[in-house]
Amino acid sequence: LMGLEQYTVPGKPVLDLGCGSGILSIAALVLGASAAAAVDIDPKAVDVAYENAALNGIGRDRYTVRAGNVLTDGALVAELARQKYALVLANIVADVIIPLSARAGEFLDTDGVFLCSGIIDTRAGEVEAALERNGLAVFERREQNGWVALAARAAR
């Protein structure tokens, strides 16, 4: 949840890549995001995320969860990219964030933030390099107990 409060823009949509239980996108909706789309490669995550959203009073009119892989499914990417997001979240391991960094820019609106976390500190440099290589400039790095969160925007 580190950085979520700071980068959720009230009235703007959020995309959660690798949503798992949906905690981050649901929290963003509670913080005022207009809508959230969430994706996970595990189909079971869809039901879990919808259940957690319902427990927080969030309906499917504002919350869409899909099973799929944005690294391999071009149709899913095209569908998600029809909307541009003020905040794109990825709380997953470095081995997924690194290839995901090539896609993140497709989803961001002009001043949108790609907030990636779940990065073990020994891999943070690799993730930063991948973000930069893919046109994203890291402007904030937070570290806690050996874990790193990076916030990046499209490089200008």
State each model region's role.
Residues 98-113:
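A short glycine-rich, Lys/Arg-flanked "PGG" loop and its adjoining helix->strand segment in the class I
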Residues 44-48, 96, 123:
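Conserved short alpha-helix immediately C-terminal to the canonical SAM/SAH-binding motif I
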Residues 1-70:
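Conserved SAM/SAH cofactor-binding pocket of Class I
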Residues 75-87:
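A short acidic, Gly/Pro-enriched loop at the edge of an enzyme's catalytic core
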Residues 111-124:
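ADP-ribose/adenylate-binding Rossmann-like module
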Residues 40-44, 92, 119:
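Short beta->alpha hinge that forms the Motif I/post-I loop of the SAM-binding pocket
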Residues 137-156:
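Core SAM-dependent methyltransferase catalytic element
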Residues 86-98:
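A short SAM/SAH-binding and catalytic strip from SAM-dependent methyltransferases
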